Amino acid sequence: MIQQETRLKVADNSGAREVLTIKVLGGSGRKTANIGDVIVCTVKQATPGGVVKKGEVVKAVIVRSKSGARRKDGSYIRFDENAAVIIRDDKSPRGTRIFGPVARELRDAQFMKIVSLAPEVL
């Protein structure tokens, strides 16, 4: 589960390396987010010359989570790290490449561009 103040690795080439969660979107009192949920973040580490700069406030979608997610068939998907992809307001990624596997739950959440760019969908 991702909550406020959680640090996540960035799984794209937008220029950010690490982000810190400011807010979980979707509901007035919502505390936690999981795979496929949109969060508001601030960039804590960034590469020089990237599209995104340090200190910038961005929206991101969670693509990998340590806590995992339960699927309809009863199985669970769990990853070794918490990772997110920085997105625009129209749900398209700001970077042009996605690094590492992403969960199949992103397809249900209408993030088809991220799913098509990912090297592996689990």
UniProtKB/Swiss-Prot annotation:
Subunit organization: Part of the 50S ribosomal subunit. Forms a cluster with proteins L3 and L19. In the 70S ribosome, L14 and L19 interact and together make contacts with the 16S rRNA in bridges B5 and B8.
GO molecular function: large ribosomal subunit rRNA binding; structural constituent of ribosome
Cross-referenced PANTHER family: 50S/60S RIBOSOMAL PROTEIN L14/L23, LARGE RIBOSOMAL SUBUNIT PROTEIN UL14M
Gene: rplN
Described purpose of this protein according to its UniProt entry: Binds to 23S rRNA. Forms part of two intersubunit bridges in the 70S ribosome.
Protein name as annotated: Large ribosomal subunit protein uL14
PROSITE patterns: RIBOSOMAL_L14 (PS00049)
Keyword rRNA-binding: yes
Entry similarity comment: Belongs to the universal ribosomal protein uL14 family.
Keywords of the record: Ribonucleoprotein, Ribosomal protein, RNA-binding, rRNA-binding
Lineage: Bacteria, Bacillati, Bacillota, Bacilli, Bacillales
GO biological process terms held by the UniProt record: translation
InterPro entries, per database record: Ribosomal_uL14, Ribosomal_uL14_bac-type, Ribosomal_uL14_CS, Ribosomal_uL14_sf
